UniProtKB/Swiss-Prot annotation:
It is found in: Nucleus, Nucleolus. One of its GO terms (biological process) is ribosomal large subunit biogenesis. The gene is LOC1. It comes from Kluyveromyces lactis (strain ATCC 8585 / CBS 2359 / DSM 70799 / NBRC 1267 / NRRL Y-1140 / WM37) (Yeast). Its main location: nucleus. Residues 7-16, 170-182 have a biased composition (Basic residues). GO terms for cellular component: nucleolus; preribosome, large subunit precursor. This is 60S ribosomal subunit assembly/export protein LOC1. Residues 1-78, 147-207 are annotated as: Disordered. Component of the 66S pre-ribosomal particle.
Amino acid sequence: MAPKQSKTAKRSKKQNGTREVRSEVFEDSIAKNQMANVPKMTEKSDTKKPTKLQVKKDNFKARLYGSQKKKERRYTEKELNIPTLNRAIVPGVKIKKGKKGKKFIGDHDLIALNRLIKTIGDKNDEITESKLEKTRRLEEIRDLKRQEMERKETEKKEQLEGKKDEIKKKASVARTIRRKTKRQELKQETLAAQSEPIKKKKSVSFA
């Protein structure tokens, strides 16, 4: 027969035994059914967790080339079109955007159009041609450029002459107006002098 256990031994055995804590939700059948219908509250994250293979590859690349983390680009106020402080924004006025100093060619400007056609593909050497053809083409381009320069000079001269004529006209108009006003003033003075009555001289008689 096995020896009888003492009371203290029994107590210690009970105390040292593992206690399992079970939630009331799992114990209670009604609560269990209610929890079954409740959707999961934790939302799925948009970013996927990288796989072990991907992590290995990234580590290998980092050891070879160093860490290649892209720096976040910082945009300037000009790029974001943020209005400058302490400046009144005029309603209804749109500020022009885009490149400044764009030069547009006229539809009937044949010299400039021909020059552009001849120079297409020069930068990347896309044209396949012999030396003789190239020299001819370059000569044509030079000639067209010279024609453009001459035309610009003539336009400038015409503009200058037009301005001169305009100034002369303005000066002549101003001169004629001045002369007219002077004549009118003189007329008015003469009329005023004529209209004034001639005062009789006082005569003194002696007895």
